[in-house]
Amino acid sequence: MNEGGESFPSETVAACRMPDEKGTVLIVNGFDRVSAPLSVRADSLAGFYTDIDGGVPDRQDISFIGAQHVFDMQMAKCEVDSIALGACACDYETEVIGGNTFDYPALHGRSVAAAGYSFCSASVRAVERGEVSPDGYSAVDLILGEQRSTTIGRGVTGYAFKTFSPELQAVLRRYMAGGGALFVSGSYVATDLWTGGEASDDDRRFAEEVLHYTYDGSRAAQRGRVRVVTSHPGFSRDEYRYVNEYRPDRYRVESPDALRPAGAGAFSVMRYVENGRTAGVASEAGGTFVMGFPFESIESDVQRDRLMRDVLDFLLK
């Protein structure tokens, strides 16, 4: 607050010291994206493809009224609103749509503390710049949410919001080479490294060598349900539900990733209930657990606490 008024809310970080802690986790918020939905313009089609990437509002959106259903450029001059280029549904006309609330370290942290671990948190920029180091922490929980390489406006400034920047990759490589443990979750953890606007061979090698997964497709599921399928004794055989529809208090997960284990000892932990595609991959030898949907999108507090306990105990046993 100053003479110019009140500034916009900033990113929220959190910390907690637990008595008789099992260890200390560094929670890194790598989800700072705010953007419009994916837009496409070709010779005959143009519009917003919200089922692939519905964009990320800044906390809340009151302008979205429904998904576009007319993309045909030949309808650009049509005078009938319902069938003209850009026509969309009106089923969310009076609804508030949830977006990025920039406070996910606190939400993750509550589950970390419930599992008996202390935690600190930092922005991904602080980690990339070397202001915060993961060295000395028992594990790192990297929040990626709906982060993905995205053009801003007309795209004249290039891409922003890459999931794993070269700087972050370098930090995580060093940390994992020193025996670290890493939990990663997000909708585009594989899509962005394989088909994103800035994807490279180095990105794919990083995913395979450090994170121990490969890409098995986007838009992997529509029903918002995953089930633990591994026989590993460290994981509870539960079903989890994540937010897959528009709500005022949570962002929607419209296009989760399907993963495939990579490297010796990597295995599937979770599968999407509707089709059996892999939703979560773990590597005991590599010290990683990666999910193709965001941890914070799991609806139930009890389910989040249970999953975080299982993940940390698996990584740090």
What is the role of each PLM region?
Residues 127-133, 221-227, 277, 298:
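A short acidic, often aromatic-flanked loop/helix-cap motif at beta-alpha or helix-coil junctions
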Residues 6-10:
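A structural signal for beta-strand boundary/capping segments at domain termini and interdomain linkers
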Residues 69-201:
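Helical hinge/lid and interdomain linker segments adjacent to catalytic or ligand-binding clefts
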Residues 123-125, 130, 165, 231-235, ...:
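Alpha-helix initiation/capping motif
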Residues 147-255, 266, 273, 307:
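A glycine-rich, often tryptophan-bearing local segment used as a flexible ligand/cofactor-contacting loop or short
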Residues 13-102, 114, 181, 194, ...:
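Extracellular ligand-binding/catalytic regions of CAZymes and related secreted enzymes
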Residues 1-4:
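Beta-strand-rich modules
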